[in-house]
């Protein structure tokens, strides 16, 4: 049904230099092609075919074009749907063109409005139960202020109002939306720029997240080590402050034996329940016969040395044990 031959070779195919691409802007289409066509002024290049576009289905148009591979340009007249009406007749051979969206005004670089662009979609069948297709048309027409009517005889203008002809020329661009080759070079470049921007943003967010995660991990580790140090230091100070006291000769050996048996048989974590039980049992098994030396120095050097442990005794400052 949709026979799309080699559209780049059509009737009157222009001789263009290798690498030539025809991707005009909306302003260029209206100013340099449509307006000159309406004014009967020679065009920059004969690259747009003249055809009554509504006498064909869209899949028949590529073979009628003078130039184009994935989008095709045509000059076409427009007829009225009803005599003396202003609505255009958009019926085609096996369907119709339906306008979508709102008209887009086209301005020159001097902010002068020169034309209007309308988007249309082709529907197969008859309205209102037509089947939507992927064929799209952009229709460009001149605004009333840019129509050359001064050079035309008055009787021609009157005759035109009484005829079905609505516009002598409009410029139409046709393409199929789902064509994999539809994107032009500008759209490809724009898509690549957008992808690069998204990847860069994603990479930056990933790096920021990684840095924050590392900082959180470092902070957690530092806090864990900090509190571990507090627990260990507190335990050591408790042992030294409470149990490094003077012993009688009879009690020194028992306390040294106690430290030897309890102090060096733990290799687990401070947070382990077994360690907590051992620590409680260690407190309960401390000899009660221990005393205080007159100078506040724990006299366990000899007993600890017997068990292979040597701890340097220290004095507690500002403590008067004789008061």
Curated annotation (Swiss-Prot):
DNA-binding region, residue intervals: 114-183
Assigned keywords, A-Z: DNA-binding, Nucleus, Transcription, Transcription regulation
Keyword Iron appears in the UniProt entry: no
Annotated GO MF terms: DNA-binding transcription factor activity; sequence-specific DNA binding
Feature: compositional bias, Low complexity: 201-221
Pfam entry (one): NAM
Any one cellular-component term (Gene Ontology): nucleus
Subcellular location: Nucleus
Biological processes, Gene Ontology terms: embryo development ending in seed dormancy; plant-type cell wall modification involved in multidimensional cell growth; positive regulation of gene expression
Domain notes: The NAC domain includes a DNA-binding domain and a dimerization domain.
Function description: Transcription factor of the NAC family. May be associated with anther development and pollen production. Required for normal seed development and morphology.
UniProt-recorded name of the protein: NAC transcription factor 25
Lineage of the species this protein comes from: Eukaryota, Viridiplantae, Streptophyta, Embryophyta, Tracheophyta
UniProt gene name: NAC025
């Amino acid at each position: 049904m949709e026979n799309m031959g080699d559209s780049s070779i059509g009737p009157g195919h222009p001789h263009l230099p290798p690498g030539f691409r025809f991707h005009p802007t909306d302003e260029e289409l209206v100013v340099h092609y449509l307006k000159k066509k309406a004014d009967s002024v020679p065009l920059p290049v004969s690259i747009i075919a003249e055809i009554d576009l509504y006498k064909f289905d869209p899949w028949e148009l590529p073979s009628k074009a003078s130039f184009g591979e994935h989008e095709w340009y045509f000059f076409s007249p427009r007829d009225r749907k009803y005599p003396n009406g202003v609505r255009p007749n958009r019926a085609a051979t096996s369907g119709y063109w339906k306008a979508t969206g709102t008209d887009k005004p086209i301005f020159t670089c001097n902010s002068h409005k020169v034309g209007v662009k309308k988007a249309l979609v082709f529907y197969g069948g008859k309205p209102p139960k037509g089947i939507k297709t992927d064929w799209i048309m952009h229709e460009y027409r001149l605004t009333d202020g840019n129509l050359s009517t001064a050079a035309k005889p008055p009787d021609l203008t009157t005759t035109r109002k009484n005829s079905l002809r609505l516009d002598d020329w409009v410029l139409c661009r046709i393409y199929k939306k789902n064509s994999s080759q539809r994107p032009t070079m500008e759209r490809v470049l724009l898509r690549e720029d957008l992808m690069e921007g998204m990847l860069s943003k994603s990479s930056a967010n990933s790096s920021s997240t990684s840095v924050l995660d590392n900082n959180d991990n470092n902070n957690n580790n530092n806090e864990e080590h900090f509190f571990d140090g507090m627990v260990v230091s507190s335990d050591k100070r408790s042992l030294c402050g409470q149990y490094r006291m003077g012993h009688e000769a009879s009690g020194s050996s028992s306390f040294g034996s106690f430290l030897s048996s309890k102090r060096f048989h733990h290799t687990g974590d401070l947070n382990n329940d077994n360690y907590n039980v051992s620590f409680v049992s260690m407190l309960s098994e401390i000899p009660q016969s221990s005393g205080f030396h007159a100078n506040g120095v724990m006299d366990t050097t000899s007993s600890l040395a017997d068990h292979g442990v040597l701890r340097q005794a220290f004095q507690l400052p500002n403590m008067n044990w004789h008061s």
